[in-house]
Amino acid sequence: MRVQRVENQMIVTVIILVGLGFGWAVACIWLSQRHPEPIWDWSAIDTSDRSFPKGFLWGSATAAHQVDGGNTNNNWARWEQSFDESGRPRVHNGDAAGSACEHWERYPEDIRRMRDDLGLRSYRFSIEWSRVEPAQGQFDSDAIDHYHAMIDAIIDAGMEPMITLHHFTNPLWFEDMGGFEPEENIAHFVAFSRRMFE
């Protein structure tokens, strides 16, 4: 009797697995027919015509934490300095963004090279919120002046500045409040954004 019950359970399990496999195969076939992979006919595409629309802006983009250097007051810096459950650094060899490429200090040279060496006409960069507002409600006028000078340098170079106000890093004070999860915290980002538009 017990053997019969085990055999019945095995048969039911096999039927369920076969049914799931069949359902998966049908779903894959249906999806591939409904949303086929695009196949380019390169023989019909004139690759010698590489023109872009008039006014197209060739540019470069950076993120403050990754290039500025010295960003130690945000959640990414905290994560870079943390360890996993086994005590290993979260980043290989314990490396961190650290001084990065020192864009904070070297931006005039970087902008000149973007224009002269690469022929770029625009530059998108991010404003590091943790530098501008290192503590809740306390704005750093030196950091704001720095970003104004950077924008002026981009314009003086004949390039168009494009600004990102949030590139995935939060000031530690904001992160410790729960970041963007609590709805009431959004007001802090709105206040920062308004200050940047002044």
Residue ranges of model-derived segments:
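Hydrophobic alpha-helical membrane-insertion segments, chiefly the h-region
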Residues: 20-29
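Small/flexible residues
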Residues: 4-7, 36, 80, 126
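N-terminal Sec-pathway targeting helices
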Residues: 2-20
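Substrate-binding cleft and catalytic face of glycoside hydrolase catalytic domains
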Residues: 69-71, 111-198
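N-terminal carbohydrate-binding accessory modules
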Residues: 29-120
